[in-house]
Amino acid sequence: MPLCRPEHLMPRASRVPVAASLPLSHAVIPTQLPSRPGHRPPGRPRRCPKASCLPPPVGPSSTQTAKRVTMGWPRPGRALVAVKALLVLSLLQVPAQAVVRAVLEDNSSSVDFADLPALFGVPLAPEGIRGYLMEVKPANACHPIEAPRLGNRSLGAIVLIRRYDCTFDLKVLNAQRAGFEAAIVHNVHSDDLVSMTHVYEDLRGQIAIPSVFVSEAASQDLRVILGCNKSAHALLLPDDPPCHDLGCHPVLTVSWVLGCTLALVVSAFFVLNHLWLWAQACCSHRRPVKTSTCQKAQVRTFTWHNDLCAICLDEYEEGDQLKILPCSHTYHCKCIDPWFSQAPRRSCPVCKQSVAATEDSFDSTTYSFRDEDPSLPGHRPPIWAIQVQLRSRRLELLGRASPHCHCSTTSLEAEYTTVSSAPPEAPGQ
């Protein structure tokens, strides 16, 4: 049966009346186990104690207990606010679950213990950290501690620290300054896992080693396992290796899906809008022009002498191409087409009626009538108008010169046209 250290062999700092500060179920005689093999009190048998005989760790210091008694516990309202704040912080900053593995007999067997990594310092590497577990003085590591004595061992050292009496960041910083590669902080009188946070910003910036928090039962088992096997060591591992897949991060997965969906919806909206505008543009170009704006001049073939062109003052001959405007005036196609192309507006040369469109190279455009007023400054009548006026004046003069000739203006015009078109006689005949 395992032997426990008698009370008179305990250090003075450990002689605390446990029954006075603990419930009746915890009032047991405290014992002290060797931290490493070979450091047992004289006269002890070389037997490894069981976990049932492990001493309960000493609770918080008397100073903190006195402060609690003096200041009192927080009020229920403040406690509720504190609980809500802790819940919010836990949602915003959830640490990754890690594992403390006790490796026995040259990696032949191992025991895992659950823990929580600290929210400060460097995170655990995927391959983990190996080292021999050691206890130091003071056990709470609130003051500078002793450096580890490894001798010829190939692995580093991992320190086991008791909770309370100071902040977590100070404990881990003292372990780092002593030369330990990692720190394990265990709970006291509880098996709950606590997320370790920092208090002092300047201390947090100096911490460069990882640290984890374990329960009280895990610390007791680690003492027994690692204290009874010389080749046993501790291995701090992250529970899950780092995952770069979106399936490991639900929030990122949902955000990615929502982002892709929104991008597809916006793209589809722009594409449909562009197609709709393109379809409207095509329909507008294919709409038929109104009947009132697409009146075209009629083209006919002249078959008999019945009139003359008001532009060139030549009679129509058989086979000439004539163009009849909407106002029923007829012109040569070779005369009216250049007229339309050079005139500032498309209108009949005689009656000035607007022509919406023609059949040969003209658009159905109606021009303004502001230039039709001859009284406007800068107005110059066209050549054909001057020729018409001169021709009318000549006919009038011919009619006055022959008072005994009872001929109409039409007959005089025809006679004048015949005379003017006859070839001149040669002299001397």
Curated annotation (Swiss-Prot):
It is found in: Endoplasmic reticulum membrane. GO terms for molecular function: ubiquitin protein ligase activity; zinc ion binding. Its main location: endoplasmic reticulum. Residues 37-49 have a biased composition (Basic residues). Residues 272-429 are cytoplasmic. It catalyses: S-ubiquitinyl-[E2 ubiquitin-conjugating enzyme]-L-cysteine + [acceptor protein]-L-lysine = [E2 ubiquitin-conjugating enzyme]-L-cysteine + N(6)-ubiquitinyl-[acceptor protein]-L-lysine. Glycans are attached at N107, N152, N229. Residues 30-67 are annotated as: Disordered. Pfam families: PA (PF02225), zf-RING_2 (PF13639). InterPro entries: E3_ligase_sorting_rcpt, PA_dom_sf, PA_domain, Znf_RING, Znf_RING/FYVE/PHD, ZNRF4/RNF13/RNF167_PA. It is a single-pass type I membrane protein. One of its GO terms (biological process) is negative regulation of nucleotide-binding oligomerization domain containing 2 signaling pathway. GO terms for cellular component: cytoplasm; endoplasmic reticulum; endoplasmic reticulum membrane. Residues 1-27 form the signal peptide. The chain crosses the membrane at residues 251-271. A zinc finger (RING-type) spans 309-352. Residues 28-250 are lumenal. Its EC number is 2.3.2.27. CDD domains: PA_C_RZF_like, RING-H2_RNF13-like. The RING-type zinc finger is involved in CANX ubiquitination and degradation, but is not required for interaction with CANX. E3 ubiquitin-protein ligase that acts as a negative regulator of NOD2 signaling by mediating ubiquitination and degradation of RIPK2. Also catalyzes ubiquitination and proteasomal degradation of CANX within the endoplasmic reticulum. Could have a role in spermatogenesis. PANTHER family: OS02G0798600 PROTEIN, RING ZINC FINGER DOMAIN SUPERFAMILY PROTEIN-RELATED. This is E3 ubiquitin-protein ligase ZNRF4.
